[in-house]
Amino acid sequence: MAPISVILVTDHKLPEAMSTTREKLLATTSKFVSTFGSFDVDEILAIRTPTCLYHQCCPSFNKNVVTNEETRANFPQFIATFRRFDFSILEPDHTLVDEASRRVMIRAKASAESIVGAYENEYIFILKMTEDCRLVDEIYEFYDTIRLKDLQHRLEAKHISYGDTAPFETRTTQF
């Protein structure tokens, strides 16, 4: 992994090339975030490369790697579980951008209405972009597992499986 470059800017202006790369990375990140509540799997996948891998990285859950095809196949479960899913960046000023490696890290929150009531969670996402910064090539997701477990328990109480307990195949993520 390339080291993160830091530029000390005293006049509040970034060099032209750095600004353009940074702006592209942030624009793609913004698109990624805006697709979460769209309930449109085509829109969600349009921001990703065809080979994008989605790493769900929480040790107390199975560490899954999900492909675009698996996302598409499992999307009906998401639609059936949530009536509304609002997703946004928390503290945008704390978003980390590594222009050299084309990575962005955000802290985000979800506020949703599920078929078993309210659901809220917080996330850390690390997005690895393509060289031109226009598509997401890899996603690393970390989330509050206690809140997700609570949702799963409420779903299980109604005999509904979701997430790691749902019947779909995934692969284990390697760090």
From Swiss-Prot:
Homodimer. This is Austinoid biosynthesis cluster protein F. Disulfide bonds: none annotated. One of its GO terms (biological process) is terpenoid biosynthetic process. Part of the gene cluster that mediates the biosynthesis of calidodehydroaustin, a fungal meroterpenoid. The first step of the pathway is the synthesis of 3,5-dimethylorsellinic acid by the polyketide synthase ausA. 3,5-dimethylorsellinic acid is then prenylated by the polyprenyl transferase ausN. Further epoxidation by the FAD-dependent monooxygenase ausM and cyclization by the probable terpene cyclase ausL lead to the formation of protoaustinoid A. Pathway: Secondary metabolite biosynthesis; terpenoid biosynthesis. In A.calidoustus, the austinoid gene cluster lies on a contiguous DNA region, while clusters from E.nidulans and P.brasilianum are split in their respective genomes. Genetic rearrangements provoked variability among the clusters and E.nidulans produces the least number of austionoid derivatives with the end products austinol and dehydroaustinol, while P.brasilianum can produce until acetoxydehydroaustin, and A.calidoustus produces the highest number of identified derivatives. It comes from Aspergillus calidoustus. Belongs to the trt14 isomerase family. It comes from the Eukaryota.
